[in-house]
Amino acid sequence: MAKLIVAIGNPRHGYANTRHNAGFLLADRLVEELQGPPFKPLSKCHALMTLVESSSGPLVFIKPTTFVNLSGKAVVLAKKYFNVALSHILVLADDVNRSFGKLRLCFNGGSGGHNGLKSITASLGSNEYWQLRFGVGRPLEEGVELSNFVLGKFSEEENLQLGSIFVEASTLFTEWCSKF
């Protein structure tokens, strides 16, 4: 049975490499490691998609072309289109409630205030799916709005750490794949 990996992020170029697009960055890295083909439009699911064959079965990666807050629409359409069990869905998302670089793989998790996760849970009618959370932290400076922070780019120091974080995330991803 196929597994559906959903990367949360905003689709426009101006949002590339922002904290809120950590899910997109992680998906790109995982697909590259798996030597998968490039993402291509799948308009019927409102997403960019790529299919990677792996030893644990087909892995369908999607990056919704909706904004973060409407991610659920793409997830429901892709779940139905690829006939994926709810428990075979993994959502890659940024997490302001975790320190930068801290990762968490969990099943049946909450939204932690993340509007993309709220949208997915509401659209699926359940939170019985997997999440791989990528800690982006919170602003250190007073007066910085959280929305501006997550829509901001990673600092130079953070960019230097992304490689080792992606290695750890890849290990957690492999662990998740082996569960089914």
Swiss-Prot record:
Its main location: cytoplasm. SUPFAM superfamilies: Peptidyl-tRNA hydrolase-like. The keyword Cell inner membrane does not apply. The keyword Iron-sulfur does not apply. InterPro entries: Pept_tRNA_hydro, Pept_tRNA_hydro_CS, Pept_tRNA_hydro_sf. PROSITE patterns: PEPT_TRNA_HYDROL_1, PEPT_TRNA_HYDROL_2. Its EC number is 3.1.1.29. The record marks 94 as: Stabilizes the basic form of H active site to accept a proton. It is found in: Cytoplasm. Keywords: Cytoplasm, Hydrolase, RNA-binding, tRNA-binding. GO terms for biological process: protein quality control for misfolded or incompletely synthesized proteins; rescue of stalled ribosome. It holds the Pfam family Pept_tRNA_hydro. The record marks 10 as: Discriminates between blocked and unblocked aminoacyl-tRNA. TRNA binds at residues 15, 67, 69, 115. The active site is at residue 20. It catalyses: an N-acyl-L-alpha-aminoacyl-tRNA + H2O = an N-acyl-L-amino acid + a tRNA + H(+). GO terms for molecular function: peptidyl-tRNA hydrolase activity; tRNA binding. One of its GO terms (cellular component) is cytoplasm. Hydrolyzes ribosome-free peptidyl-tRNAs (with 1 or more amino acids incorporated), which drop off the ribosome during protein synthesis, or as a result of ribosome stalling. Catalyzes the release of premature peptidyl moieties from peptidyl-tRNA molecules trapped in stalled 50S ribosomal subunits, and thus maintains levels of free tRNAs and 50S ribosomes. Belongs to the PTH family. Monomer. HAMAP family: Pept_tRNA_hydro_bact. This is Peptidyl-tRNA hydrolase. It comes from Chlamydia pneumoniae. The lineage of its organism: Bacteria, Pseudomonadati, Chlamydiota, Chlamydiia, Chlamydiales.
